[in-house]
Amino acid sequence: MSERDKTLEHAPLGRESAYPEHYDAGLLFPIPRQANRAPLGLDDAALPFEGEDEWHAFELSWLDAKGKPIVAVARFRLPADSPSLIESKSWKLYLNSFNQTRFDRREAVIDTLERDLAQAAGASVAVALFGVEDDALMPRALPGECLDDLDVSIEYYTPTPGLLEVGEEIVEETLHSHLLKSNCPVTGQPDWGSVLIRYRGPRLERDALLKYLISYRQHQDFHEHCVEHLFVDLMARARPERLLVMARYVRRGGLDISPWRGTPGERPPTPLRLARQ
């Protein structure tokens, strides 16, 4: 049994769980990143990328000092160099534990979230709260050229980096696809997503790139590690000067996850949400 499998044996994901009635930071379940990174040749002490895991939580509520419910949408930014990610069902259960908990101030909610999530992840986690009608939550479109209308024949549905091809021309461009699909490593549930690739380097052949992205269709892994797998393969096969890979996964259980990884200095487009999130 792998180290990851040993860890996931005790995770709430895939198990029946009682929903908490009282605040409980102990519900958060960290998963060390290194166990999944080792097969990719990655070392936490010398990562070839920067990045974050951006989460949105749409089912966040608490009580004010008088017992009146307050609702909000939360955005969390978990750094890619944190020792651990946080298992999604445990995160959901933790947020549900706020439902009947009283807070005097909105800032107290943020302080509590930042403290507890940092403790679980082993690094600072940025927290922002939005009103449910905030314009920042409106869906937007991914920048760049969409690959999805290319006429390609597909043979592979597990990650196949050998599909990637590059030309001799050096370009700087942004490409995206909405055909990304991977699967939860615990439950096997499908994880649907969109992926953006921004780079400067030898021109990626579009047909080959789309075939490669589709090859994740039967792959089982966490969202965060799928993005790291994409990054590692693209760096190895295309050797770009600069690279950003960002996936925006469809919401499940009131949470969506949008990891990005980039070469030093790269940053994703302005925070955005897609229609499927």
Swiss-Prot record:
InterPro entries with a match to the protein in the record: GTP-CH-I_C/QueF, NADPH_dep_7-cyano-7-deazaG_red, QueF, QueF_N, QueF_type2
Function of the protein: Catalyzes the NADPH-dependent reduction of 7-cyano-7-deazaguanine (preQ0) to 7-aminomethyl-7-deazaguanine (preQ1).
Active site: 184, 191
Domain of life: Bacteria
Descriptive protein name: NADPH-dependent 7-cyano-7-deazaguanine reductase
Main location: cytoplasm
NCBIfam families tied to this protein: QueF
Chain positions recorded as substrate binding sites: 86-88, 223-224
Biological process (GO), any one: queuosine biosynthetic process
GO molecular function annotation: preQ1 synthase activity
Coiled-coil regions listed in the entry: none
GO CC terms, sorted: cytoplasm
Assembly and oligomerization: Homodimer.
Metabolic or biological pathway, per its Swiss-Prot or TrEMBL entry: tRNA modification; tRNA-queuosine biosynthesis
Disulfide bonds: none
Protein family per UniProt: Belongs to the GTP cyclohydrolase I family. QueF type 2 subfamily.
Keyword terms of this UniProt record: Cytoplasm, NADP, Oxidoreductase, Queuosine biosynthesis
Protein localization: Cytoplasm
Pfam families associated with the record: QueF (PF14489), QueF_N (PF14819)
Ligand binding (NADPH): 88-89, 252-253
EC number: 1.7.1.13
